[in-house]
């Protein structure tokens, strides 16, 4: 039998013993107070998050991938963060990948036993053709999910970089990673429900890892997402606004260059900032490794 009694995420919260007797307002205040603790817990982990981001940047520069792996809520959060990288940063869906124990079906329904399989974690990475240039980030609130451990151990065999994210201290998965992240948010508002504070902490950290690593490979100019993909009307208008903000041009100028650049926001910005045509702008960006700032030198 697995002993979960020592895990912080499984302990009862002294502040919510009488949860079923609270009014809606009382429960809301309690839950909000618990949630306030999460950002401070994440702050404590910043020194351990930094090397994971550096490793992700290194992986991207080598043509490698960032691969999130988890089960249940942890897996879903990884899939969500990976999916958002495509429209936000204009990267291919293969560059940041989210894998969940049990496959796509597990995004909406529980797949019994999937998280308990070491072999399944290994096999999912084999199917993905894991390489030594990749970074695997195993996510498990409990810090002991076999699916994640199996994946991390296979990554070690291949020579890929390994990171882990747990919401318990001294987590088992930390022993299987080069770059372990452990966040102690305290017991959950609802005992054992790690979709709450643990899930919030994981989301905050995944936001940090994906966003700051993308900054590190030139996907941002100032604080603007210049590689955004205008896949709908809202994003088309946002793209023009980004061009205006980056170059201090008019709406009409932004629209003109946006169209000349074939709706490539970053290229339109370089064309305006360096007063060049589209082809020359492309050449400048290639020489600058995709960093807008470096085209201005």
From Swiss-Prot:
<dbReference type="InterPro" id="IPR005488">
    <property type="entry name" value="Etherase_MurQ"/>
</dbReference>
<feature type="active site" description="Proton donor">
    <location>
        <position position="84"/>
    </location>
</feature>
<dbReference type="InterPro" id="IPR040190">
    <property type="entry name" value="MURQ/GCKR"/>
</dbReference>
<keyword id="KW-0456">Lyase</keyword>
<dbReference type="GO" id="GO:0097367">
    <property type="term" value="F:carbohydrate derivative binding"/>
</dbReference>
<comment type="similarity">
    <text>Belongs to the GCKR-like family. MurNAc-6-P etherase subfamily.</text>
</comment>
<dbReference type="Pfam" id="PF22645">
    <property type="entry name" value="GKRP_SIS_N"/>
</dbReference>
<dbReference type="InterPro" id="IPR046348">
    <property type="entry name" value="SIS_dom_sf"/>
</dbReference>
<keyword id="KW-0119">Carbohydrate metabolism</keyword>
<comment type="function">
    <text>Specifically catalyzes the cleavage of the D-lactyl ether substituent of MurNAc 6-phosphate, producing GlcNAc 6-phosphate and D-lactate.</text>
</comment>
<comment type="subunit">
    <text>Homodimer.</text>
</comment>
<dbReference type="GO" id="GO:0046348">
    <property type="term" value="P:amino sugar catabolic process"/>
</dbReference>
<dbReference type="GO" id="GO:0016835">
    <property type="term" value="F:carbon-oxygen lyase activity"/>
</dbReference>
<dbReference type="InterPro" id="IPR005486">
    <property type="entry name" value="Glucokinase_regulatory_CS"/>
</dbReference>
<protein>
    <recommendedName>
        <fullName>N-acetylmuramic acid 6-phosphate etherase</fullName>
        <ecNumber>4.2.1.126</ecNumber>
    </recommendedName>
</protein>
<feature type="active site">
    <location>
        <position position="115"/>
    </location>
</feature>
<dbReference type="GO" id="GO:0016803">
    <property type="term" value="F:ether hydrolase activity"/>
</dbReference>
<feature type="domain" description="SIS">
    <location>
        <begin position="56"/>
        <end position="219"/>
    </location>
</feature>
<dbReference type="GO" id="GO:0097173">
    <property type="term" value="P:N-acetylmuramic acid catabolic process"/>
</dbReference>
<dbReference type="GO" id="GO:0009254">
    <property type="term" value="P:peptidoglycan turnover"/>
</dbReference>
<dbReference type="InterPro" id="IPR001347">
    <property type="entry name" value="SIS_dom"/>
</dbReference>
<comment type="pathway">
    <text>Amino-sugar metabolism; N-acetylmuramate degradation.</text>
</comment>
